[in-house]
Swiss-Prot record:
Residue span(s) of domain tr-type G: 65-261
Residue range of the transit peptide in the UniProt record, numbered on this chain: 1-51
Organism classification: Eukaryota, Viridiplantae, Streptophyta, Embryophyta, Tracheophyta
NCBIfam families found in the cross-reference section: EF-Tu, PRK00049.1, PRK12735.1, PRK12736.1, small_GTP
Modified residues (Phosphothreonine): T82
Keywords carried by this UniProt record: Elongation factor, GTP-binding, Mitochondrion, Nucleotide-binding, Phosphoprotein, Protein biosynthesis, Transit peptide
Protein name (record): Elongation factor Tu, mitochondrial
Length: 454
């Protein structure tokens, strides 16, 4: 998945949580949200989707603005989903979005029952400057794993904090996770300001928020913090803290979150997020393209999570994004690829679709890791050789074991160490690839592959 470590070129030590990390490494880590919202999950079982005319009947996607992936993160009930719905409503009035109701974003039965977001939901909208894909990340502690899959594809994040409550436990965890999975920039929305009577309280909350951002190595003093009420914007009341605040927020997102650099000149590679079967047409794999370009008619290989490491072969017969047809998909796009000759059960989340011959799979690799401290949300105690955490590599979530060097008996929280890691199944790996280690529902370490082995 991701890393918060960087090799200092002037030393052999890994530098954790450095402010230089993302400017040097970039945020190329890819892991995707549940794209069923984008590809039309409800449509997948419909007869219209299964007809041969479906792909031809969709509108064509026009690529006339930079495409940027953003998302809302923050504590449960602080208003992330309300803000997402409010953004689409306000921009729809400007002719730059389709308004999506709160219930459409929060649409899983268990979400409505519990009033929280579980699967990462997805909407699209435009500003005068950009085209945005927006992920609404869950805030409930039980679903941090889903938050990771949403956050890792963001080019920038919108951190939502309730004015009356201030930063809460999941606020802190989401800021930490945003740092770990490589979200390069954050903009903050201080929500529910209409229910705060004392303006000094908002000043204190803003001060606390800036200190928290600085603690996790974001530029807390510089990050724009927009005050407003997502509910007022959604209901069309109190224009100043409602509609105007949303427009001000989108201006801040346009200006503060830099245009992402897309890797278009490398061979095509897309980690699979989800898989659907379309009767009479084939299998659709969804995900965010990590690098390169894919065109209709091109041959691809599907690698990873297969014993023996032999790749599957297929041809891409359709490329789709936001229910619109693309002639080609390129790095940064969240797409569905229609694959010829494959069954739904042949492929799974965590595999990678790549240009034939451009990618190899490995079980064993050497990596440099930074072990998070207790204060950073990591382990309280040391670990030893044969420690078996979960490895998050792109969209794969796979068990593996740690083999420490002979001269290292144990690794303490806060340590940097070079070790050998062995996964239970092969996955595509390359030098410089970042990943996270998780155990018991928390991130305990992050690293970068230094050498692939077998």
């Amino acid at each position: 998945m991701a890393s918060v470590v960087l090799r200092n070129p002037s030393s052999k030590r890994l530098v954790p949580f450095s402010s230089q990390i993302y400017s040097r490494c970039g945020a190329s880590v890819t892991s995707s949200y549940s794209i069923s919202h984008s590809i039309g999950g409800d449509d997948l079982s419909s007869s219209t989707f299964g007809t041969s005319s479906f792909w031809r009947s969709m509108a064509t996607f026009t690529r006339n603005k930079p495409h940027v992936n953003v998302g809302t993160i923050g504590h449960v009930d602080h208003g992330k989903t309300t803000l997402t719905a409010a953004i689409t409503k306000v921009l729809a009035e400007e002719g730059k979005a389709k308004a999506i109701a709160f219930d459409e974003i929060d649409k899983a039965p268990e979400e409505k029952k519990r009033g929280i977001t579980i699967a990462t939901a997805h909407v699209e909208y435009e500003t005068a400057k950009r085209h945005y894909a927006h992920v609404d990340c869950p805030g409930h502690a039980d679903y941090v794993k889903n938050m990771i899959t949403g956050a890792a594809q963001m080019d920038g994040g919108i951190l939502v904090v309730s004015g009356p409550d201030g930063p809460m436990p999941q606020t802190k965890e989401h800021i930490l996770l945003a740092r770990q999975v490589g979200v390069p920039s954050l903009v903050c929305f201080l929500n529910k300001v209409d229910v705060v009577d004392d303006p000094e309280l908002l000043e204190l909350v803003e001060m606390e928020l800036r200190e928290l951002l600085s603690f996790y190595k974001f530029p807390g003093d510089d990050i724009p913090i927009i005050r407003g009420s997502a509910l007022s914007a959604l209901q069309g009341t109190n224009d100043e803290i409602g509609r105007q605040a949303i427009l001000k927020l989108m201006d801040a997102v346009d200006e503060y979150i830099p245009d992402p650099v897309r890797v278009l000149d490398k061979p095509f590679l897309m980690p699979i997020e989800d898989v659907f079967s379309i009767q009479g047409r084939g299998t659709v794999a969804t995900g965010r393209i990590e690098q390169g370009v894919i065109k209709v008619g091109e041959e691809v290989e599907i690698l990873g999570l297969r014993e023996g490491g032999v790749p599957l072969k297929s041809t891409v017969t359709g490329v789709e994004m936001f229910k619109k047809i693309l002639d080609n998909g390129q790095a940064g796009d969240n797409v569905g690829l229609l694959l010829r000759g494959l069954k739904r059960e042949d492929i799974q989340r965590g595999m990678v679709i790549a240009k034939p011959g451009s990618c190899k799979t490995y079980k064993k690799f050497e990596a440099e890791i930074y072990v998070l401290t207790k204060d950073e949300g990591g382990r309280h105690t040391a670990f030893f050789s044969n420690y078996r955490p979960q490895f998050y590599l792109r969209t794969a979530d796979i068990t593996g074991k740690v083999e420490l060097p002979e001269n290292v008996k144990m690794v303490m929280p806060g340590d940097n160490v070079t070790a050998v890691f062995e996964l239970i199944m092969p996955v595509p790996l390359e030098t410089g690839q970042r990943f996270a280690l998780r155990e018991g529902g928390r991130t305990v370490g992050a690293g970068v592959v230094s050498k692939v082995m077998t």
